[in-house]
């Protein structure tokens, strides 16, 4: 064996050993997108500077059958398409549902199927679907009905062959694992699971659990963090402040969730940061990368830096 041959053999062996030593989930890169309800986000220079190609929007489950909602989503998707972006459209409760108060309307499977067929007919180019947003949360009619949510997924899977489907999009509340166990007993062929992991990204003092590791243990397949980020301020409906205003804390939270996604990037395939800019109407939930004047917050610059690392892609 020549010196060159021995050297090449040694390098090959070292490469193999280094790859074997990597922790599970250390391969691949996590795709980052933005969750936002405002279509005018996509023509802003600061948004263009991030180079993002994925966006998530939440819309009523019967959007294609509701004139006002349909017109709004038409405008939104028109701007998404003009910006060359791929939308993830996630369904949720329809007006005038006010869960957990009344009315709290859970559509029948047949009604959901009629609405989804109309959706496919109007927007056939949308091929990335979230079946139901935060389906295990008490503000959703699916809260106590995971089996019904699973039947919605079965409908979407049947009617959208070849689509990327987020089977169950859950928030990391205490009921998450139990809810998913019931969901999985009815769902057929789920491959992508969505999570809003605010307990991991924004842990509170005394909190004993987050949802990401639990979800990874509970389900098989890929996980998309469909809504996450750093909370600047959050006021509860009863007026109590859960998170007082702090851009610094929000920036730390965003870094925390990006490191978590990096750690589990073999399972976590996508991450949608929520949201772009705080509005001028006093929204109770503020996690914007920009403040209400359009000034970038520290979290904007943190996201921009992480996007340029090898662990993440657009």
Predicted regions and their residues:
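Active-site cleft segment of glycoside hydrolase catalytic domains centered on the general acid/base Glu
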Residues: 41, 65-72, 97-220, 228, ...
